[in-house]
Amino acid sequence: WKLEEIYNLKDLFEKWTICFVPILNPDGYEIYENDFFAIRNPIYRQMLRMQEVSCKEFTGNARGIELRKNFPTGYYRRKQIHQQPASENETKALVRLFQDDPGRGLLSFGYAGKRIVYFRQSQAFTANQKSYRMARHLQKCSASDMDKKNFHLEDVEPAGRQGYGSPEQFYTEICHQPAFRIEVPCENEVHAASIEKQIEYREIHTLPLEYIFSL
């Protein structure tokens, strides 16, 4: 019941429930692994091939929708006239989860740079200061050397471009709780099995626990 000789998981699970959503974009995962042949609908498959985007660089679902920009945030912007927020089943499922059980915070993990992003709320100075302090704490906890910050810290304003249609911004708007995105570099398969990847995992695997114990 002890993790890293620090975290008493027995006490934690008697008081808290951690909800894991493993893959927000299962279509994207299948496309990455199996090329566009993973798309069963021949019309969508041909449509995405015509975009001339490599399956390894493609970030949408089987319908070509970027799910990270599909949430109905206050500053949602369409890229195309026919696009609508929360149009995808994957988005609707997560929206329903947030509405049914708002929880006390959201930590999302993804590939990009090496940074911890915290999302601000509109007209909520105290809440935003709390999110900033928590982000700093997570930044320190992710460092293997406490004197060296491995993750860059960044914030997103409610009207900021990064927040348009994102699940984190949507969560802060409807649940009024802190939301963070922890990003790690996307490397090749050789790197995935390397010692560096194991170190990277150790840097972030306790962040959800640190968040809970800091509430």
Predicted regions and their residues:
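Active-site/substrate-binding loop(s) of hydrolase catalytic cores
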Residues: 1-127
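C-terminal accessory segments enriched in acidic
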Residues: 71-215
